[in-house]
Amino acid sequence: MSRGLGDVYKRQLPAFHIYLIAHIFAIGCFAIIGSLLFALYNYQIFGYVFDMLRKTQLYEEHYVDPKGVTLTFPSCKRNIIHIYLESIENAYLAKASGGGQDVSYMPELDALANQNINFSHHNQIGGSLTLEGTQWTIASMVGQEAGIPLLVPFNSKSYNDKSNFFSGVYTLGEILEQHGYINEIMMGSDSNFGCTSNFYKQHGNYYISDYNTAVEEGRIAKDYFVFWGYEDKKLFEFAKADITKLAKSGKPFNMELVTIDTHTPDGYVCEDCQHKYKSQYANVIACQSKQVNNFINWCKSQPWYENTTIVITGDHNLSLIHISEPTR
C-alpha cells in the first residue's frame, strides 16, 4: 500500500517534538546553572557561606574593648566631618592612580586623596578590605564606628529593637559624646531604613537630620521626593547651614553626612550633572566628585576649618561590579 508524504510527516512529528523539547530543556538547564554560578561568583556567596561556617579567634585575640581604653583628648578638641559616599570606591579612578578605568571618573577625589592623608595598602590610592557583614550602608557604619561586622539577621530582636540596638557595642559616637561633642548625622533618605536611626540614637545621642526632618522643618516641600528622598546637592547645602550653627555652639562637633545619588543601579542625575560619559552612572559619579570637592572648598573658607578633621570614605564597594582586587 502506498503512503503519502502526509502519512510520513504525521508519523515523524512526535519524535521531532521530543528532540526539540529535549534541546530546549538542555539549553534552559545550562542557562539556569550558568546564571546561578555567575551570581554565586559575582556576589561571593561561596565565600560568605564559608566565612559563616568558619570559627576564628579574631576577637578573642585582637579585639580591644574601647570601654576599657583611656583616651586623652587635647584641651582644644578638633571638630570632625565624616562624609560617607554611597558605593564609592577606587575602581572609578584611572588605572594610573590604582583604579580600574582608562580615565578617572572622579579626578577631584583623586586630587584630594593625593594632597592629603590617604590610607592605602600600596603606593597608589588603595582601599580597605571589605569584610562580610560590612557590605551595605548600615553595616559599613557599624563596622567603621564600632569595629565589628553586622552579622545579626535582619529579623533578629537586637537588629529591630528600637530601644536596645546592640547595647553591648561601644562606638565612636559614644566616645565623642562622653568627651563633650555634639553629634549629628544628615542624609537625604529615611533614617528608619535599615534601622539607621536606631543605631545613631542609641550610640552617641545623635541629632538625626533626614528626609523626614527636612519636610518637618520646611526645608523641602511635603510632596517633594526624588530618588530616595532629596538629592545630594541639597544635602551639602543643608549641611553648610547646620555646620555653621554647630560651630557657633562653643562645643566640638561631629557631623556625619551620608550621600545617596550614587546608589545603584544608575544613580540620580541632578541638575548639576554633566553628560560627559556614555554611562549615566559614570556621569553621576563624576558629579558626586565635583560636589564633594566644592563642599571641601567651602569648608576651607570657614573660620573653624583649621581645627577640623574631614574624613571621606565610601560606605561599601559597588556590589554590581566584580573586580578581583578586594581592597578597593
Q: What kind of feature is each model-predicted range?
A:
Residues 1, 62-66, 293-296:
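Short, motif-level signal for alpha-helix interfacial/capping segments enriched in acidic residues
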Residues 201, 258-265, 311-320:
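Acidic helix/loop microenvironments that form the catalytic cleft of cell-wall polysaccharide enzymes
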Residues 115, 244-250, 297-307, 328:
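Secondary-structure transition/capping motifs at alpha-helix termini
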Residues 28-78, 82, 89-253, 260-276, ...:
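Active-site-proximal alpha/beta segments of enzymes that process anionic O-linked groups
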Residues 13-29:
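Membrane-interfacial entry segments at the cytosolic side of transmembrane helices
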